[in-house]
Amino acid sequence: MKQYGKVAVLMGGSSSEREVSLMSGAGVLSALRSKGVDAHGFDPSEKPLSALKEEGFDCVFNILHGPFGEDGTLQGALEALGMPYTGCGVMASAIAMDKWRTKLLWKGAGLPIPAFELLDENSDFDAIERQLGLPIFVKPSTEGSSIGVTKVKQPGELRAAFEEARKYDKVVIAEQFIGGGEYTCAVIGETAYPTIKIEPATEYYDYQAKYFRDDTVYRCPSGLAPEVEARARELALKAFKVLGCRGWSRVDFLMDEAGEIYLLEANTSPGMTSHSLVPMAARAEGIAYEDLCLKVLDTVHVG
C-alpha cells in the first residue's frame, strides 16, 4: 500500500524478551505483506537505527519488547531521526516500562491499585510481609513478560524473592496479592476493546503460560456483568490517558472476590504472537489479525 510507504517492522533486539519480539514481528510482517504493505523486518541488534534512513524506510511498526524498545530509548532515537513510529511516545513509554512509577502516577490520579512497597537491601522484610500479607508478588520494576517475578507464599521468603528480582533490575517492588481473577483490556486509539479473563493452568500467569503453554484459558468475552465490563474499559482508558499513552497499549488489571478492580500495569508494546491478547480482543470485535495490524500502523506518529 503506497499510503504507508516502506515500513520497517522493528523486531528482535537484545532484551530478555527478544524471543517473544521475534515471534510477534514474524506475525506482523506476514500480516502487513498480505495486505500489500511494503514491509521489511529490521533487527536493531544487527544494524544501527541510522540504517532506517539510509535504506529508505518511511515509518516504523515497533514490536520490540523490554528495555530499549519499550522504555522510551528507541522512541527518543526515532524522534531524533524524524521517523514516524507506532505506539507510545518517549515519556509514556518510559513511565509504563517502570511499574513503580506507573503505580505512583495512577495512585496520584485516584485510580485503584494494589498496595505495594519498594524494596531494597535495607528493607524490613518481615515487617513488609506482615503489612502486605501473604502471598506477595515480588517484581523487577522494568522487566516484562513476568520475568524475574516470584510469588512469596511462606513467611521469611521475601528477601530471597527480592534477591532474585534484583538480578533483573535495581528497583524491586513487593505487591499485595489480589485473589479473584486476572484480566486485560486492549486500547487502540480512543477505544477500549473487550476485556479478557486469563485463567493460567500454572499458579500464576508466568512467562511460559504467556507464550508457550497451551493449557492457559483465555475467556473473551470475559464473562463480566455488563456494568462491570463498562467500568473496566473505562478504567483502562483512564489509565492509558494518565500515562500519556497514544496509539495502542494493553492495560492489565485484577479483580477481587468483591468485584473491585485494581490496575496492575500497562504494556505499551503488546505481544502479537498466536498466544497474544490484543489480537484476541480484536477478534471479539470482528477484526482480523491482518486488519488489526493495519489499525496499529494507522497510528504512526512523530513528535
From Swiss-Prot:
One of its GO terms (cellular component) is cytoplasm. It is an enzyme of class 6 (ligase). ATP binds at residues 129-184. The keyword Lipid biosynthesis does not apply. Pfam families: Dala_Dala_lig_C, Dala_Dala_lig_N. Binds 2 magnesium or manganese ions per subunit. It catalyses: 2 D-alanine + ATP = D-alanyl-D-alanine + ADP + phosphate + H(+). PANTHER family: D-ALANINE--D-ALANINE LIGASE, D-ALANINE--D-ALANINE LIGASE B. Cell wall formation. This is D-alanine--D-alanine ligase B. It comes from Chromobacterium violaceum (strain ATCC 12472 / DSM 30191 / JCM 1249 / CCUG 213 / NBRC 12614 / NCIMB 9131 / NCTC 9757 / MK). The gene is ddlB.
